[in-house]
């Protein structure tokens, strides 16, 4: 199976493709991520609350927030910006030793960038609607590629509430 749900209240969770290559992520990484997400959501109220970090061998190397509204460009998703920054910092085309963590399941556009960047582990805190995220790629698509990341959904109330409040405010604004 390519997608796993992991309880966020556990003390630690492990993400691994092989027994000999385990990336251990503890609650500190998740806690720091959620604190930063909450801070950014209050600062950037016009943007969808999508926040992404990339870790290279367990070290934070890149973090970005959505800039779609700020730049008036639909390609400025946090995942794509974060991947660009990470590649620049590491001076590489592929992010093979990296883990991407993001507040919302990557959309199909971001999924393409993740696949082409060969990021082996993708963690997201809120699933996308059916058919709109990386986990909805077809079996044919997955097996036609020589690479596909492991996907982990770790649902959190903070991420869920950030998106709920964002869309509640948006609906009021346009009604």
Model-derived regions: residue spans:
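Short beta->alpha transition motifs characteristic of CBS
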Residues: 61-68
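Immediate flanking context of iron-sulfur cluster ligation sites
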Residues: 92-104
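Zinc-dependent deaminase
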Residues: 1-47, 106, 112-175
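Short beta-strand scaffold segments in enzyme catalytic cores
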Residues: 49-56
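A short, polar/charged loop-to-alpha-helix boundary motif
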Residues: 68-81
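A contiguous binding-surface segment within folded domains or other stable secondary-structure elements
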Residues: 83-95
């Amino acid at each position: 199976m390519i997608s796993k749900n992991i309880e966020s209240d556990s003390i630690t969770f492990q993400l691994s493709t092989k027994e000999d290559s385990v990336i251990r992520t503890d609650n500190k990484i998740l806690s720091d991520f959620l604190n930063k997400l909450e801070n950014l959501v209050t600062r950037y109220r016009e943007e969808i609350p999508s926040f992404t970090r990339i870790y290279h061998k367990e070290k934070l190397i890149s973090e970005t927030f959505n800039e779609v509204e700020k730049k008036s460009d639909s390609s400025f998703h946090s995942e794509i910006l974060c991947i660009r920054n990470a590649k620049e910092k590491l001076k590489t085309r592929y992010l093979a030793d990296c883990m991407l963590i993001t507040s919302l399941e990557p959309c199909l556009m971001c999924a393409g960038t993740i696949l082409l960047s060969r990021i082996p582990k993708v963690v997201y805190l809120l699933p996308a609607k059916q058919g709109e995220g990386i986990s909805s790629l077809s079996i044919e698509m997955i097996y036609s590629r020589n690479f596909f990341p492991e996907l982990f959904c770790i649902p959190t109330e903070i991420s869920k509430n950030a998106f709920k409040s964002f869309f509640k405010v948006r609906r009021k604004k346009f009604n």
